[in-house]
């Protein structure tokens, strides 16, 4: 298995566990920085497109809210802003609670939907939809008020 992964992927890291019950971990990708290592189980079955497993939108919402709960970055608000078109705040909070039942704190998440202190210093993502940071912030505040 190790030889195959190292031959097929530019970056392949094989975990060095000596405890048999822990199994083996493999991190693969193009570079170390582009590789993903994730241990939490998904709350929805993964999407499989052309043999590539991907997280569902619901899964991504839960993960983004988890980041927001600890003061999100500009890109997180940008992503969530797009998702507010199809999901209510209650739906988003329910997904976060389902995925992170032990750390879920709806009050903190709601408060952090309008806490842009950390994000304001980030560079603006390149938005192909022509959105602007100041508008996104106002929309996020309104989203929570409507919530």
Region roles according to the model:
Residues 1-147:
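Compositionally biased terminal segments of proteins
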């Amino acid at each position: 298995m190790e030889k195959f992964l190292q031959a097929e992927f530019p970056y392949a890291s094989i975990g060095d566990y000596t405890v048999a019950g822990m199994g083996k971990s493999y991190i693969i990708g193009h570079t170390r920085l582009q590789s993903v290592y994730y241990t939490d189980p998904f709350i929805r079955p993964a999407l499989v497109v052309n043999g590539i497993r991907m997280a569902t939108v619901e899964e991504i919402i839960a993960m983004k809210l988890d980041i927001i709960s600890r003061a999100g970055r500009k890109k997180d608000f940008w992503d969530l802003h797009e998702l507010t078109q199809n999901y209510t705040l209650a739906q988003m909070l329910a997904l976060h609670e389902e995925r992170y039942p032990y750390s879920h704190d709806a009050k903190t998440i709601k408060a952090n939907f309008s806490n842009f202190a950390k994000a304001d210093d980030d560079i603006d993502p390149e938005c192909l939809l022509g959105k602007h940071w100041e508008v996104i912030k106002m929309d996020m505040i309104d989203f929570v008020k409507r919530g």
